[in-house]
């Protein structure tokens, strides 16, 4: 991983990642690229002052965003899958397809259902119709799923 100061659209032969150091989605994208031994350039954006080139490429304005040749990938799970398919270490060969499917299912549950409930609990004052305890309890389903997986 090479940190760069700007995006160079003429240099598309090396994957380029718009990232943010503390974003968990960007972290897992970087980890997958590194784990797959893919050399890439990373540009750490400032969330309060997003570069216009970044917004031109991905109007959604969220990180991570990977650019390689003419392809733009703006979801961390898709960047992870791209990295493991393209990487020289062929990480997929380490796992059975069933294990990959289980992992992807857990990631999706985390990113969608659990994150929604966790945000409601974290910002409970925005949800006055539910008690903080009820909001907390709504997060437990995911922890129970993880607990069952760990018991296997």
Q: Language-model segments: what does each one mean?
A:
Residues 1-144, 151:
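GST-like domain detector, emphasizing the conserved glutathione-binding G-site
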């Amino acid at each position: 991983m090479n940190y760069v100061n700007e995006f160079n659209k003429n240099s598309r032969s090396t994957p380029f990642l718009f990232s943010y150091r503390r974003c968990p989605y960007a972290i897992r994208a970087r980890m997958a690229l590194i784990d797959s031994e893919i050399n890439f350039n990373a540009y750490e954006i400032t969330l309060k002052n997003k570069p216009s080139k970044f917004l031109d490429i991905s109007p959604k304005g969220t990180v991570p965003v990977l650019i390689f040749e003419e392809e733009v990938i703006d979801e961390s799970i898709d960047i992870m899958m791209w990295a493991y398919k393209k990487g020289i270490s062929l990480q997929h060969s380490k796992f059975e397809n069933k294990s990959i499917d289980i992992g992807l299912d857990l990631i999706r549950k985390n990113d969608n259902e659990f994150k929604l409930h966790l945000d409601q609990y974290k910002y409970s004052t925005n949800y006055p119709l539910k008690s903080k305890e009820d909001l907390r309890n709504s997060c437990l389903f995911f922890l129970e799923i993880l607990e069952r997986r760990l018991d296997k």
